[in-house]
């Protein structure tokens, strides 16, 4: 019989093996060292490329952060931003949930005390090709981009990433994201779910447990209806404009944009939103260089598209930082000499390359995942005008799920953080006073909510 000392040694060796087994030669080549401006931390992080198509030379860029403590026992979470065309490195990692936030000059980094890798191992992926550092050597690939293309490439990425980091293959796996990732996340989850049913190739199995969606684009008709209703309800547009839209627009129809009154009414909302930050109605806009202030023409050309976006000042700081030679070299994005022109959102994906497919609704996928027993949580910052809380509530109501627990406030540090409701198979919560990118506005509350999600328990429902 083993004594206490031997048991301790055995446990230590098991833990050590868990770390060592994650360090494949490829993984060690991706280990980030001497990252410019990085605060001193005890966890490791890795960055680099995973080739998803050898023939076309298509590769996706990732940045992976071990959990701050006990990475060998904590789950793995993939974070995706939307767009289509926006970077999970520039937004999720840099402005929201990553451990290193870019300062207000783009010169250095500051530690994020509310980083989500306090609770999990976090993997950021720039997808599809053409986003951030991700690329293809075959230019025709860029004209094939769409939801299905992105889901397939993301799945291939995961399979190859797990070969590089085998210690994470069997961990509980979750997918999280916001805005247009409201499409990406369930679509990728569906691919994983379907592929996992292939009992003849168990080596491809991914231990998917659930999805987490923030201010997500979900269903075309409900998203647009909620967008219009929210703008009127928050006094952004006149009663007359609202009346015209309600009378002339049928967002369930493919031809609604051919109706002159409908298009002009929607244009009027966009015109008014030009004056403020649509993604956060009650915060100031950045005046020195605001892509939002100058984006009215882009909105008009991308109707009926809905796309991601955040505080343009933060976007600018990220652009400065990730175009530095020393930063690109440290992240293994380039050799530090032949630099890439990194942008936080690639407008070409919508404006020039087109987007070949976008599901009108992912609610059928919600139903499929719920029936499969996966955890589905949705949250919404209630001051976001782009993918507003009304849109999300309309979408959830469309599912007609039985209510499990009554609508009630949830709390963080004795204050009301938002409201919360559990349905059979789905959990919905709001964040009071948060805009589109909720963790940027409510970092402490978001971390607490994320922890509750991982544990499958409600956030605090009393002070």
Swiss-Prot record:
Expressed in flowers. It holds the Pfam family Peptidase_S10. Glycans are attached at residues 137, 201, 250, 341, 354. The active site is at residues 179, 384, 436. It is found in: Secreted. Keywords: Carboxypeptidase, Disulfide bond, Glycoprotein, Hydrolase, Protease, Secreted, Signal. This is Serine carboxypeptidase-like 32. GO terms for cellular component: extracellular region.
């Amino acid at each position: 019989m083993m004594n206490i000392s031997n048991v301790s040694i055995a446990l230590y060796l098991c833990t050590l093996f868990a770390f060592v087994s994650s360090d494949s030669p490829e993984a060690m080549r991706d280990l980030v060292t001497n990252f410019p401006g990085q605060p001193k931390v005890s966890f490791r992080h890795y960055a680099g490329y995973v080739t998803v198509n050898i023939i076309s030379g298509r590769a996706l860029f990732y940045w992976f952060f071990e959990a701050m403590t006990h990475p060998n026992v904590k789950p793995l979470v993939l974070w995706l931003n939307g767009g289509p065309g926006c970077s999970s490195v520039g937004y999720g990692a840099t402005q929201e949930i990553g451990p290193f936030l870019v300062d207000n000059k783009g010169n250095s980094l500051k530690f994020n005390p509310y980083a989500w890798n306090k609770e999990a191992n976090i993997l950021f992926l720039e997808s599809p090709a053409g986003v951030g550092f991700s690329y293809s050597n075959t230019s025709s690939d860029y004209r094939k981009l769409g939801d299905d293309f992105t889901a397939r490439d993301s799945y291939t990425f995961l399979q190859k990433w797990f070969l590089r980091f085998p210690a994470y293959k069997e961990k509980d796996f979750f997918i999280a994201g916001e805005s247009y990732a409201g499409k990406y996340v369930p679509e990728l989850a569906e691919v994983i779910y379907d592929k996992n049913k292939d009992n003849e190739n168990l080596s491809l199995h991914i231990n998917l447990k659930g999805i987490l969606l923030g201010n997500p684009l979900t269903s075309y008709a409900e998203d647009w209806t909620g967008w219009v209703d929210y703008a009127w309800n928050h006094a952004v547009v006149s009663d007359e404009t609202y009346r015209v839209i309600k009378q002339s627009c049928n967002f369930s129809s493919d031809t609604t944009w051919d109706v002159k009154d409908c298009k002009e009414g929607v244009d009027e909302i966009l015109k008014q939103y030009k004056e403020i930050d649509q993604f956060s109605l009650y915060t100031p806009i950045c005046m020195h260089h605001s892509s939002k202030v100058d984006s009215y023409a882009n909105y008009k050309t991308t109707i009926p598209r809905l796309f991601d976006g955040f505080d343009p000042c933060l976007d600018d700081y990220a652009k400065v930082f990730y175009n530095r030679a020393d930063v690109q070299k440290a992240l293994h994005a380039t050799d530090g000499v032949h630099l890439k022109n990194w942008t936080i959102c690639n407008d070409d994906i919508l404006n020039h390359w087109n987007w070949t497919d976008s599901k009108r609704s992912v609610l059928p996928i919600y139903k499929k995942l719920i029936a499969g027993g996966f955890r589905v949580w949705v949250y919404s910052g209630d001051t976001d005008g782009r993918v507003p809380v009304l849109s999300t509530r309309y979408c959830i109501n469309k599912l007609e799920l039985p209510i499990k627990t009554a609508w009630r406030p949830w709390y963080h540090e004795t204050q009301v953080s938002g409201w919360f409701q559990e349905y059979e198979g789905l959990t919905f919560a709001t964040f009071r006073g948060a805009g589109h990118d909720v963790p940027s506005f409510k970092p402490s509350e978001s971390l607490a909510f994320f922890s509750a999600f991982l544990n499958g328990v409600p956030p605090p429902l009393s002070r």
